[in-house]
A protein has these predicted regions:
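Mature N-terminal segment immediately following signal peptide/propeptide cleavage
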Residues: 43-60
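Short, polar loop/linker segments at the starts of domains and inter-domain junctions
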Residues: 60-78, 266-275, 428-436
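Sec-dependent bacterial lipoprotein signal peptides
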Residues: 1-11
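Short, small/polar residue-rich loop motifs at catalytic or cofactor-binding pockets
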Residues: 45, 220-221, 303-306
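Active-site microenvironments of metalloenzymes and redox enzymes
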Residues: 14, 81-276, 322-328, 338-390, ...
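A short, compositionally biased domain-edge/stem linker segment
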Residues: 29-44, 208-214
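Disulfide-stabilized, aromatic/cysteine-rich ligand-recognition loop
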Residues: 11-33, 37-39, 64, 137-145, ...
Length: 460
């Protein structure tokens, strides 16, 4: 009888998930209520496509006709990540502006700072006034890529998008209720929610009663962000369609297999596969037989996607990436997830607390835009403001560059990739690098977002 009872207890206990190291049950209020989620894989955020990472040769795929020598080939590894299938459209950005207008109704400067610069269409010797007035807002252009957005504005949009997606996920999971009365001083952000500053109205998720979602629940997603240069180039090439037995069977010059610019599909033979400038004065071809069919950007879902399913990774608009520009980054950056532009920030736990940093390690380690290129490690001066000063490091790290006199490169120079509707074929190669200041904008530059992939490296 005792043996039978033991079996019954054992069978009953086996149905309850328990710790393999302590034996205590999970999800049991009587044991303290340590909750583990049934979710094991990351939720795929709206608009994203899984990009399975791997090793590839990053850098020039064409002859360097401009002799810039800023993208010499080298082998690197990129971790798996997610990326927007299309460029961010005018409609997507108008949704952002609408939210800001509603929440920051008493702060018009916030809204004004987020608006695209429509004057980027203006040209002293070209009639583009209609584009200034209607391109961003008219419904005819709602599916066209947003332009006139600076690198800073693109980052702000990505942060806003992260919060709106996470807010919707919490609402769908029953962890939060809708709140259409959010204000500048009280609105949902992921950080505010996790810190307990924004509470909303939570609902029950376990038997203990109401509680907020946590990272451990697997509901909240990582931040949307701009892709790194390496991620963008890797995704644009789409070599996953050219691999066999752990080898790349054929390198690509462009995001498509052919070294030409026209489709070899029998149904579309001779059609251009991207939106670009064919030659001087030829933006779309001849009436009755247009080639790419667009004098300006085309809708974000146009032409053919690459092997990852991404649209317009060559042509249409160039795209901002996360990196700070340096012509010799390929010599400096790591061979795993290469990136220049790290800024390490510490959370503020209490005000009026002075950190004792007598050996200046915190200041020197946090600002890595210039690492090995004008930073503390690479300085040749034994005594200067950077090594002895107590002010913000970014004020002194640019000493290596005399910006405006000897160079246009600074800590505010950001990379943008890919050709645009106004560029020739050379710029359609994903390896080509260009840069602008992070607060500048152009009628030829847009952006798309990316997100870290958590867990398995396999694309799902």
């Amino acid at each position: 009888m005792l043996f039978v009872s033991f079996l019954l207890v054992s069978c009953t206990s086996s149905t309850q998930p328990s710790s393999r190291t302590t034996g205590w049950n999970y999800n049991d209020a009587e044991n303290g209520g340590f909750y583990i989620s049934d979710l094991r894989e990351q939720i795929i955020g709206p608009g994203l496509v899984a990009i399975e990472g791997g090793t590839f040769t990053m850098g020039s795929t064409l002859e360097n006709v401009y002799y810039e020598w800023n993208n010499n080939p080298r082998k690197v590894t990129v971790s798996s990540f997610y990326m927007d299938q299309t460029e961010v459209s005018n409609l997507d950005y108008l949704e952002y502006i609408n939210w800001l207008t509603r929440v920051y109704v008493d702060y018009p400067q916030v809204i004004e700072n987020a608006l695209p610069d429509t004057l980027v269409w203006r040209n002293s010797l070209s009639y583009n006034e209609p584009m200034i007035e209607i391109y961003f807002r008219h419904p005819a252009y709602r599916d066209y890529p947003v332009v006139g957005v600076s690198w800073k504005q693109a980052n702000d949009y990505a942060l806003w998008r992260s919060d709106r997606v996470n807010e919707k996920l919490l609402i769908d999971a029953g962890m939060l209720s809708y709140n259409n009365n959010q204000t500048k001083d009280y609105h949902f952000t992921t950080e505010a929610y996790l810190a307990g500053v924004y509470t909303g109205t939570a609902t029950t998720m376990n038997q203990e009663g109401n509680r907020k979602a946590k990272i451990e629940d697997g509901i909240l997603l990582p931040k949307y962000r701009l892709p790194t240069e390496a991620e963008w180039e890797y995704a644009a090439l789409g070599l996953i369609g050219n691999t066999q037995n752990e080898n790349v069977s054929e390198r690509k010059v462009y995001p498509w297999n052919s070294k030409g610019l026209r489709s070899d599909d029998s149904n579309y033979m001779g059609s251009f596969v991207a939106n670009f400038k064919r030659g001087n004065g030829d933006y779309m071809g001849i009436a009755g037989n247009l080639n790419d069919g667009a004098t300006i950007p085309a809708p974000v879902v146009s032409y053919w996607p690459n092997d990852y399913g991404l649209y317009n990774m060559a042509g249409n608009v160039s795209e901002w990436v996360l990196d700070v520009y340096r012509p010799l980054s390929y010599e400096d950056v790591n061979d795993q997830n290469p990136f220049r532009g790290n800024l390490y920030n510490s959370e503020l736990f209490s005000e009026n607390v002075e950190i004792n940093d007598s050996i200046k390690r915190l200041r020197n380690a946090a600002y890595n835009l210039n690492i090995y290129d004008g930073d503390f490690v690479s300085t040749i001066q034994e005594s200067n403001d950077w090594t002895n000063g107590t002010e913000s490091p970014e004020k002194y790290t640019s000493q290596m560059y005399d910006y405006g006199n000897t160079t246009l490169i600074s800590d505010k120079s950001r990379v943008y990739k890919g050709g645009s509707w106004a560029d020739g074929p050379y710029y359609l190669s994903p390896s080509v690098r260009r840069f602008m200041n992070e607060d500048e904008a152009s009628s030829t530059v847009g952006f798309r977002c990316a997100m870290n992939k958590i867990g398995s490296a396999l694309a799902k």
